[in-house]
Amino acid sequence: MEARDIILRPVITEASTAAMDNKRYTFDVDLRATKTQVKNAVEEIFDVKVVKVNIMNVKGKQKRQGRYVGYTKRRRKAIVQLSADSNEIKLFGDDNE
């Protein structure tokens, strides 16, 4: 798998945004991705130094459409801790530039 296939999208929530102050970034990753693959992909794409990777599997939530019941897709979240001397990842575009 290539690096762009492993990292699918950043997770932007209140908790993940607060964790960015401590250089912890949350990404949705491929269901088959390992911690080592996620670490190498983040280092390659964003040119940063990763210290630690935590991964969790998130079950799909039950959703109803009338009397029919279905589930949202399951996903895999990776929380990536960058080193103290590493640059920050710019997830949001700067309006000043």
Curated annotation (Swiss-Prot):
How is this protein organized at the quaternary level?
A: Part of the 50S ribosomal subunit. Contacts protein L29, and trigger factor when it is bound to the ribosome.
Name a GO CC annotation attached to this entry.
ribonucleoprotein complex
Q: Name one GO molecular function term.
A: structural constituent of ribosome
State the protein's purpose.
One of the early assembly proteins it binds 23S rRNA. One of the proteins that surrounds the polypeptide exit tunnel on the outside of the ribosome. Forms the main docking site for trigger factor binding to the ribosome.
Q: Name one GO biological process term.
A: translation
Q: Does the keyword Chaperone apply?
A: no
Q: Which gene encodes it?
A: rplW
Q: What's the name of the protein? A: Large ribosomal subunit protein uL23
**Which keywords belong to this entry?**
Ribonucleoprotein, Ribosomal protein, RNA-binding, rRNA-binding
Task: State the organism of origin.
Answer: Limosilactobacillus fermentum (strain NBRC 3956 / LMG 18251)
Which family does the record claim for this protein? Belongs to the universal ribosomal protein uL23 family.
Record keywords: Ribosomal protein included? Answer: yes
Q: What is the lineage of its organism?
A: Bacteria, Bacillati, Bacillota, Bacilli, Lactobacillales
PANTHER family xref list: 60S RIBOSOMAL PROTEIN L23A
